[in-house]
Amino acid sequence: MTDTVPPRAALRQRSLVVKATSGLDRPEAANQAFTVAAAAVAAGVEVSVWLTGEAAWFGLPGRAAELELEHAAPLPDLLDAVLAAGTLTVCTQCAARRGITADDVLPGVRIAGAAVFVEEALREGAQALVY
């Protein structure tokens, strides 16, 4: 008998925290953050995406559709994949600076601060990426 864990089972024991810092100002970075997050969700990984800076706008209805990037999956599709099986959070300070409230964001999107981000990023088995 082997003690080797199957790859998918091993992935389920890990979590991925993705911090998206770019919006329409840097479309490739913005799309890449969601592409990686959606791929991780599809692999069965626990995923949390944090929308900071200009990426905070993607937490609002219709905003993801404004990003168009050739040869990339549409951002609304990627965002929906993350929302279906992961967590999507808008940074508290970023939301406040942009006048975004809990009533403004998409269903399933939360607004939370740095303490929650640090807790998620430092959780055992977590990997954090910043785009």
Regions found by a protein language model. Name each.
Residues 2-9:
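Positively charged, low-complexity intrinsically disordered leader regions
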Residues 15, 46-48, 87:
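Residues at the starts of beta-strands that form the adenosine-phosphate
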Residues 55-69:
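N-terminal beta-loop-helix "entrance" segment that forms/cooperates
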Residues 98, 102-106, 111-122:
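A short aromatic-anchored loop/beta-hairpin motif
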Residues 129-131:
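Aromatic- and Gly/Pro-rich donor/ligand-binding loops
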